[in-house]
Amino acid sequence: QGRPPRPHIPP
């Protein structure tokens, strides 16, 4: 499988 999705980091 590919890499897991990155968590959303707000600006």
UniProtKB/Swiss-Prot annotation:
GO terms for biological process: regulation of blood pressure. Expressed by the venom gland. The keyword Plastid does not apply. The keyword Cytoplasm does not apply. The modification Pyrrolidone carboxylic acid is found at residue 1. It comes from the Eukaryota. It is found in: Secreted. One of its GO terms (molecular function) is toxin activity. GO terms for cellular component: extracellular region. Keywords: Hypotensive agent, Metalloenzyme inhibitor, Metalloprotease inhibitor, Protease inhibitor, Pyrrolidone carboxylic acid, Secreted, Toxin. This peptide both inhibits the activity of the angiotensin-converting enzyme (ACE) and enhances the action of bradykinin by inhibiting the peptidases that inactivate it. It acts as an indirect hypotensive agent. Belongs to the bradykinin-potentiating peptide family. This is Bradykinin-potentiating peptide 2.
